[in-house]
Amino acid sequence: MQPGRWQLHTLSQDGGRQVHAGFDAVLLLIPAAQASALLQASDVAPGLAAGLHAVEAAPCWTLMVAYPHAVQPGLTTLGPQWNAARSTHHRIAWVARESSKPGRAPVERWTAQASPAWSSEHRNDAPARVQAKLLKAFAEVTGLRAAPVHAEVLYWPDAQTTRPLGRSHLWDAAAGIGLAGDWCLGHRVEDAFVAGLELALAVA
């Protein structure tokens, strides 16, 4: 063990333990709620944990569907001719055709994100129930009523920041621990990039 240096303890799925040592700093680039829980479970940098209390985030149920049977001669897509749209449907806020993106396999695939309000209201619902409701809503939004070959849902508890930290990062030089994420400045990928860059510059 090296005095003043960080150690990382890992636990594998088969129960094996490893210790990695000699790190100058720890940077937590995770949701604010998870970072807060980690900091509160230790006595390191209590001031950083206190700064996270103001951050708020909304959940999101996300539906992913695939239609491999669309890949056949004379049929390139199913459903609408647009590739992405915001929605005013009470369940779904955003839909995107993943297979339209550059470099993607030619298998008709869509992602649909439920609205923050609906996701919050149904946060404790069983995934199968959520999937059935979102499939129905997806068909109503897109007009695509063919049964998908694959469908699954994923729940993100901290998907979209509703009240950001208001600064690009948090960094405690004495403890050697820093925090950053999109939740520092907003909820977009650009916010995550800027937060990470600013933290890296502070550490350097």
PLM ranges: what are they?
Residues M1-A21:
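Conserved beta-strand-loop-beta-strand element in the redox core of flavoprotein oxidoreductases
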Residues S12, P31-A32, P116:
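Short glycine-/small-residue-rich Rossmann-like dinucleotide-binding loops
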Residues A132-A175:
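Flavin (FAD/FMN) cofactor-binding core of flavoprotein oxidoreductases
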Residues T111, S168-A200:
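Short FAD-binding loop at a beta-strand-to-alpha-helix junction that anchors the flavin cofactor
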Residues M1-W6, P106, T161-R163:
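A short, glycine/Asx- and small/polar-enriched loop/turn
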Residues M64-Q72, T76-R123, R129, K133-T142:
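Active-site substrate-recognition segment that forms the wall
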Residues G16-G79, L144-A146:
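Central helical "cap/lid" subdomain
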Residues A202-A204:
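Active-site-proximal substrate-binding core of FAD-dependent oxidoreductases
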